[in-house]
Amino acid sequence: MKKFISNRFVLFFLGVIFVTLLWIVLSLSFDRNGAIFPSPLLTFQKFFELLGDSYTYACLAHTLARMGIGFGISFIFAFVLGILAGNHPSMYHFLKPLIVVLRSIPTVALVFLFVVLITPRDAPILIVTIICFPILFEGFVGGISNVDKQYIEAAQIDGASYFSRIAFVKLPLAMPYIVVAMVSSFALSFKIEIMAEAMTGYTRNGLGNVIAFAKGDAEDATPMVTVFAYALFAVLLMLIVSLIQELVTAWLKKKGLAIVNNN
């Protein structure tokens, strides 16, 4: 029984039940017709209705594609600069002020700034890139910096080159840090993309755009039901990402690699 309760997947499922019950309580506390805080029943009814609409998939694909571009750009920069900074502390200290600045800038300020500086249509991509880069960068740096020096010295004794030590020793051992950073930044980038789409108001066929439109739809008596239903797509996607993280983490642990944030 104790082993059953301590199982992470069982606890995850119990957590989902708790969140659902909390959702029901909050919806009953605020209103009963779904105009302000719709219940899970109303939300899922609308959710399944949206599942039958091809436009929903176009919006989801549009948002994921734009988010993927921003995430991919930030990953490339983080990969290159993170490896350099992880292997050369002087490079890390040189880039540290930039990382602090990027971490500190409010996302809303970036939205307003890039709407003015570049095409509003492309602003969400650049915002995702800037927000994700520091997280991914720290993941690469942290992973490489925490590799046991004994492995590096053993590779040097075997005659491994500088690039071979990075590719076949440091990066594999740094994977737990990198995976955690990737999952965290991916989840954040999805939320940022939706928010940026909603705030710019210029992107077509995006989840942020349809959420903003649903909120201001005067013909809809319960606009928040539609908003919650579209938001549910993001929640379910993040649950899938979390499951993938658990599977990858379990695989890394099976391979004998140290796991970070595994509680």
PLM feature spans:
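Alpha-helical transmembrane segments of multi-pass membrane proteins
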Residues: 11, 57, 61-70, 103, ...
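Short cytoplasmic-facing helical segments at TM-TM junctions of multi-pass membrane proteins
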Residues: 139-178, 207
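Hydrophobic alpha-helical transmembrane segments of polytopic membrane proteins
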Residues: 206-245
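Transmembrane alpha-helical segments of polytopic membrane transport and secretion proteins
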Residues: 1-17, 239-263
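Transmembrane alpha-helices
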Residues: 126-130, 163-195
